[in-house]
Each structure stands twice: as structure tokens, then as C-alpha cells.
From Swiss-Prot:
Belongs to the class-I aminoacyl-tRNA synthetase family. Glutamate--tRNA ligase type 1 subfamily. CDD domains: GluRS_core. GO terms for cellular component: cytosol. This is Glutamate--tRNA ligase 1.
């Protein structure tokens, strides 16, 4: 397959939805697999709802995911002259017509059909009228003259052939009375003008496909290959909504997910390559095809996503993991150079206990010796109920240690536990709570070796 050109065409009316990100990913992978082009089009014809902030959210979301597009971004708001020109050509060819029917009249017809329990298709009285009858005091819309007979077949690579009778397709508006193009016309003109060969999008667009094909045919354009993929659902099987969790790509970034894991997870939501779960971007480009798309809605599962993210976290080298951790810590703390060194020394033990960057950041706070330690509630309770004399004994013994490496510290704690008739883990519970502010953490002996005697004693003396 040669000269493949795909596109991602979001509307800038909010954040970059996770479902839209998957659509972008599939288009990106298909284009890259065939050494083709992946284009970006911003469908901003809805002036009231489109915002610059949403456009920036789309750009930043795609860049964060690593989905780089080819060429310049196309903005529909800057192309109305082309759409208008196309509508006028259809008018001159007798494939479109001026319609002067008001919205109020159309609504009356709709209500009448509802009352009679009839399927409503607007039939304009102006479809075949002589131009001599046109009123001069009303600005008309331009409507497509949809064929009344026959049918349109959507040849979908995933859904199969979907046949829609022309009698169920209305004479849709192409150009509004103010001269601006409708979404339907703009999409078709853009896809043709941009040379789009393959349209891959959510199956919520399937109902639009027949209407768009009617415009393609009227314009004499070749219809691109179409693939309508099932939408993402929540774990309960219902259509994805806010109650199922974060919906925007930026939210997943804020929640501590890595772009590599998000791409891997989205890829597996509706596409498969045998039993492979861990798939790098390079592998995805090599393997991606439309034949392996699923026909059933995929379910968003945070447990699987967390597991994938943990895998990708552990692939990070020490410096990269430290850098990502410190970057987030600095949103709330002044992190010193020495504290960065501590975190870097501890990073491997932190990574194996983390599923997200948020987990990593929380554990890394143990090594912020210049900031007050934050005690979790269960750690507070252990500290409040512990044997204060025992902690004083720990302080005295550790203070005498000349070597403060992991092994020496561990041996000293074993000695203290035996002397007091305690199991080692019984002794370590209050010690861990005091040193880390937590009840579960990396090895206290490792923490002691990294932070050194002075910092450890300082935390123990808080009691």
C-alpha cells in the first residue's frame, strides 16, 4: 500500500479526550506503518464553542504522547472560501439548491411527524422551484439535492457494508445563510483537498458517513477507505463518562502515567497482536494493521493501566527517573542538590514499589531532609502508642555506631531487638514510622545508609 494519508480531526471545544487520543494513535500508527503521512486538522467551525485553550490542549496532548503530525496544521476556520466555492459549484451543477424555509417551519414539520409517529425527513418546497420565485428579502441556505431513489453503501473495513436508503437521508445544509459552511461539507472538502486515503474514527461517526458519502458523490470525489472503531467503555460496560475516571490526556499525565504506557494501553484497547501486552511504539508501527481491530467496545481498566505503567517506570534509567521525580517534587518543595543525590541513590528501590509517578514522588519525600516530614495517620498512631524509652535506646545505640552502612545498621537493630525480647519487625514498626512517616516503605536500613547518621537521629529524636 502506497501514499497512505490519514488524519486526526478534533474539535477544539474541551480537553483532548482519551478516546480521541486513541483515534489519533490508530491513525498515526497506520500512516507510519505504511510510510505515509499523518495530518492534523482542527475542526473549529463552531466559533462559539471553540477555544484557543482547547487547541493548545490538543497540541500538547499529542506531543506528550509522541504523536507527531506531518506538515502544517489545517484550521477549518481559515478555509471557508474553499467550502463556499464548492457549494456554489454544486449549485451550478444542479446538485444543490437555495432553500428559504425558516427553522420555525422546519420545527413545525418535525413536531407534526412526531405527533403522527412518523420518521422525520425534511422535504423542502424549494428543491425544484424556479429561481424566479425566490424571495429577495430572505437569505437562503444551500442544501444538497440528495437523490430520492436508491441507497448509499458505507464500505467499512471493520463493520462491513452498511446500506442506508437515500429516502432516510435529508437534503442537508451545506452553506448556512451567513455564508459559513456546515461541518458535513467542510469535512468532505478537507478530506479531498488534503488527499486523505483512509478515515479511521469512532463508530459514533458511522451515522454521518452516509451523509458525507452523498456529498463525496455529488462533488465527484473518490470516497476514502473508512474504518469506524467501537468507542471505549467503562469497566462496567457503560459508555465512558466522567464517573469512570479521568477523561483528558492531561489528567493522565497529572496522575503520574508515562506517555509510553498510555500509548501502549490505548493500543490494546481495541487492537491486539496475539497475546502481546507490552508493545513499544516501534513494535506498534511495525505490527499495526486494521485487520486486528476488535468489533466490540473496549473497557477502560485502571488496574491494567497501572500494571503497564509500573513496567514502563522500571524501564527508566536512574537519572531519568530521578529527573521526573524531582521535577514533580519541585512543584511543592525546594529540593536541594544533596536531596537529589539521595533520591538518585534510592531510585531503584522506589521504582519497584511504584505504579505511577505520584507513587514515586510520595516515596521520594522520605529523602527530603530539609523539609518537615509528613506523617500518615496510621504512622502517627504507631508513634503515639510506641515505647518511648525503646526509641531512646535506639538513638543511643545508633549514635555509638562508627560505621553507618546498611549491614552495620541492620545488625545493630537485631541486637537491640534481641536485647529487648522483640522480633525485629516489632522494633522496626515505630522506627519506620518515625523515619519515613509511613508504615510501608523501602528498607529502613537502606534509607539509613543513604541519609546518614545525623539525619536519621534527627528524625528519631522528634519523639
Amino acid at each position: 500500500m502506497t501514499n497512505v494519508i490519514t488524519r486526526f480531526a478534533p474539535s477544539p471545544t474541551g480537553f483532548l479526550h482519551i478516546g480521541s487520543a486513541r483515534t489519533a494513535l490508530f491513525n498515526y500508527l497506520f500512516a507510519r506503518h505504511h510510510n505515509g503521512k499523518f495530518l492534523l486538522r482542527i475542526e473549529d467551525t463552531d466559533k462559539e464553542r471553540s477555544t484557543n485553550e482547547a487547541v493548545e490542549a490538543i497540541f500538547s496532548g499529542l506531543k506528550w504522547l509522541g504523536l507527531d503530525w506531518d506538515g502544517e496544521v489545517i484550521f477549518q476556520s481559515k478555509r471557508n472560501d474553499l467550502y463556499k466555492e464548492t457549494a456554489l459549484k454544486l449549485l451550478q451543477a444542479g446538485k444543490a439548491y437555495y432553500c428559504f424555509t425558516s427553522q420555525e417551519e422546519i420545527e413545525k414539520q418535525r413536531q407534526k411527524a412526531l405527533e403522527n409517529k412518523q420518521y422525520f425527513i425534511f422535504n423542502s418546497d424549494w428543491r425544484d422551484k424556479d429561481p424566479a420565485a425566490y424571495p429577495t428579502d430572505i437569505k437562503p441556505v444551500i442544501r444538497l439535492k440528495t437523490p430520492r431513489e436508491g441507497s448509499i453503501t458505507i464500505r467499512d473495513t471493520l463493520q462491513g457494508d452498511v446500506v442506508i436508503e437515500n429516502s432516510h437521508i435529508d437534503d442537508m445544509v451545506l452553506l448556512r445563510s451567513d455564508g459559513t459552511a456546515t461541518y458535513m461539507l467542510a469535512v468532505v472538502v478537507d478530506d479531498h483537498d488534503m488527499g486523505i486515503t483512509h478515515i479511521i474514527r469512532g463508530d459514533d461517526h458511522l451515522t454521518n458517513a452516509a451523509r458525507q458519502i452523498a456529498i463525496y458523490q455529488a462533488c465527484g470525489y473518490a470516497v476514502p477507505s473508512m474504518t469506524h472503531i467501537p468507542l471505549i467503555h467503562g469497566a462496567d460496560g457503560a459508555k465512558l463518562s466522567k464517573r469512570h475516571g479521568a477523561l483528558g490526556v492531561a489528567a493522565y499525565k497529572d496522575m503520574g502515567y508515562l506517555p509510553e504506557s498510555v500509548c501502549n494501553y490505548l493500543l490494546r484497547l481495541g487492537w491486539s497482536h496475539g497475546d502481546d501486552e507490552i508493545i513499544s511504539m516501534d513494535q506498534a508501527i511495525k505490527w499495526f494493521n486494521l485487520d486486528s481491530l476488535g468489533k466490540s467496545p473496549a473497557k477502560l481498566d485502571f488496574a491494567n493501566m497501572n500494571s503497564l505503567n509500573a513496567h514502563y517506570l522500571r524501564l527508566l534509567d536512574n537519572d531519568s527517573a530521578t529527573s521526573k521525580t524531582v521535577e514533580r517534587l519541585r512543584q511543592n518543595y525546594n529540593v536541594s542538590k544533596q536531596e537529589v543525590i539521595y533520591i538518585n541513590q534510592a531510585i531503584r528501590s522506589l521504582l519497584v514499589r511504584s505504579e505511577t509517578l505520584l507513587d514515586l514522588v510520595q516515596l521520594a519525600q522520605i529523602y527530603l531532609v530539609d523539609s518537615p516530614i509528613i506523617y500518615k495517620q496510621d504512622a502517627k498512631e504507631i508513634i503515639e502508642n510506641c515505647d518511648k524509652d525503646l526509641i531512646k535506646q535506639v538513638i543511643e545505640n545508633l549514635n555509638k555506631l562508627k560505621q553507618f552502612d546498611k549491614e552495620s545498621v541492620q545488625n545493630k537493630f537485631k541486637e537491640i531487638a534481641t536485647h529487648n525480647g522483640l522480633k525485629l519487625n516489632e522494633l522496626m514498626k515505630p522506627v519506620r514510622a518515625l523515619i519515613t512517616g509511613m508504615t510501608a516503605s523501602p528498607s529502613v536500613f537502606e534509607i539509613a545508609e543513604i541519609l546518614g547518621k545525623e539525619n536519621i537521629l534527627k528524625r528519631l529524636k522528634i519523639i
